[in-house]
Every structure is written in C-alpha cells, then in structure tokens.
C-alpha cells in the first residue's frame, strides 16, 4: 500500500538540509544516513549517500532512475546464501 497522494513524498529534514548545503557549495562528499525511509528527490542526483543496512553503511550513488524510490531499496538488509544442498550422493 503506497503513501497517500495528498500527503506527498517524505524525506527527513536533516538529510534534505545536508543535500541542499552541498548543492549550494558544489561539493561532492559521502553523506552517512540511517534514514532508509526517505524518498529520493531530484536534488539528490549525483550525490553518494551511505545508507545503513543494520551492520554497515552501504554507499549508494544516486542516478536519475532512482528518483521517487526510497533509500532503503538500494541497501539490502539480508544476505541470501542459498538453500541447503542435496545430500543424496553422500548417503550411499
């Protein structure tokens, strides 16, 4: 279930302030954030944001295709290592 259109997209204030400050000065640096729930805005394009996945900060370079998605979509929290193998060969 998506967010109501009358509410509009959400982005944490502290993250938006950091992005706007970097856009004004023209600097490019990695921004660490724990805000996986924030929507990616067009102002974010070209910046690298390190999104926390529960263990470490995963660097995510923002491109035009990512606008409208959430930051958490690009930093997976679980690592799938595959299902258990078939032990038919060893049972004989």
Swiss-Prot record:
<dbReference type="GO" id="GO:0015935">
    <property type="term" value="C:small ribosomal subunit"/>
</dbReference>
<dbReference type="Pfam" id="PF00203">
    <property type="entry name" value="Ribosomal_S19"/>
</dbReference>
<keyword id="KW-0689">Ribosomal protein</keyword>
<dbReference type="InterPro" id="IPR005732">
    <property type="entry name" value="Ribosomal_uS19_bac-type"/>
</dbReference>
<dbReference type="GO" id="GO:0000028">
    <property type="term" value="P:ribosomal small subunit assembly"/>
</dbReference>
<keyword id="KW-0694">RNA-binding</keyword>
<dbReference type="GO" id="GO:0005737">
    <property type="term" value="C:cytoplasm"/>
</dbReference>
<keyword id="KW-0699">rRNA-binding</keyword>
<dbReference type="GO" id="GO:0019843">
    <property type="term" value="F:rRNA binding"/>
</dbReference>
<dbReference type="GO" id="GO:0003735">
    <property type="term" value="F:structural constituent of ribosome"/>
</dbReference>
<protein>
    <recommendedName>
        <fullName>Small ribosomal subunit protein uS19</fullName>
    </recommendedName>
</protein>
<keyword id="KW-0687">Ribonucleoprotein</keyword>
<dbReference type="GO" id="GO:0006412">
    <property type="term" value="P:translation"/>
</dbReference>
<dbReference type="InterPro" id="IPR002222">
    <property type="entry name" value="Ribosomal_uS19"/>
</dbReference>
<dbReference type="InterPro" id="IPR020934">
    <property type="entry name" value="Ribosomal_uS19_CS"/>
</dbReference>
<dbReference type="InterPro" id="IPR023575">
    <property type="entry name" value="Ribosomal_uS19_SF"/>
</dbReference>
<comment type="similarity">
    <text>Belongs to the universal ribosomal protein uS19 family.</text>
</comment>
<comment type="function">
    <text>Protein S19 forms a complex with S13 that binds strongly to the 16S ribosomal RNA.</text>
</comment>
